[in-house]
Design a protein with these regions (language model features):
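Short alpha-helical hairpin
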Residues: 15-23, 53-56
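Bacterial N-terminal signal peptides
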Residues: 5-16
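N-terminal targeting signals for Sec/Tat export/insertion, comprising classic cleavable signal peptides
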Residues: 27-56
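Conserved active-site-adjacent core of cysteine acyl-enzyme catalytic domains
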Residues: 19-31, 49, 61-176
Length: 176
């Protein structure tokens, strides 16, 4: 009987220690939306809106094709960042566009807030993705790339190089 009680106490203490240890990262269950041609901005906004709709128990109704038609600029060949912000505000979101840092990603993801970031790979155009998670032990970013796939892993060094090339542009959108 004593051995069994000691084993139970040891298990409880180990379980509690495991819970108190820092988790290796964070991942948010953001709905994935793929893009139409030049539609990474609309798809990224749709992912953020659907995430918050799901959090509120509402139907996920963000229509990416309507957003693309509404926001697309032939002059830019895509969607301006200011138009993403304006559209989100019109839909009842508070927006905060900042020149982000790694700690900003960690801070907001830990609070359950996914982010849209702009990336620029090489000489290519700007590309919007949704940062849905981080693994800070392995220095990995988990991003939803509307032109690629859900939860695409990218090493921090590569991510930060592409993010820096886009001015570290970061957009936080939260429901009002």
């Amino acid at each position: 009987m004593f051995c069994r009680a000691a084993a139970i106490i040891a298990f409880v203490l180990l379980f509690r220690a495991a819970l108190d240890a820092e988790l290796p990262g964070v991942w948010l269950d953001v709905p994935y939306v793929s893009q139409e041609k030049n539609g990474c901005g609309a798809a990224s906004v749709a992912m953020i809106m659907r995430y918050w709709q799901r959090q509120k128990g509402q139907p996920e109704i963000a229509d990416v094709l309507d957003m693309q038609r509404l926001l697309y600029s032939p002059r830019s060949g895509g969607i301006y960042a200011s138009d993403l912000e304006r559209h989100l505000r019109q839909q009842g979101y508070r927006t905060f566009a900042v020149q982000g840092e790694w700690q900003d990603l960690k801070h907001h993801l830990e609070k359950g807030r996914p982010l849209i970031v702009a990336l620029k790979a090489g000489r290519g155009d700007l590309h919007y993705v949704v940062v849905a998670g981080l693994d800070w032990q392995q220095n990995i970013v988990l991003k939803h790339d509307p032109a690629g796939r859900k939860l695409l892993k990218q090493h921090r060094v590569d991510f930060e190089r592409e993010w820096k090339a886009a001015g570290n542009w970061t957009l936080l959108a939260v429901p009002e």
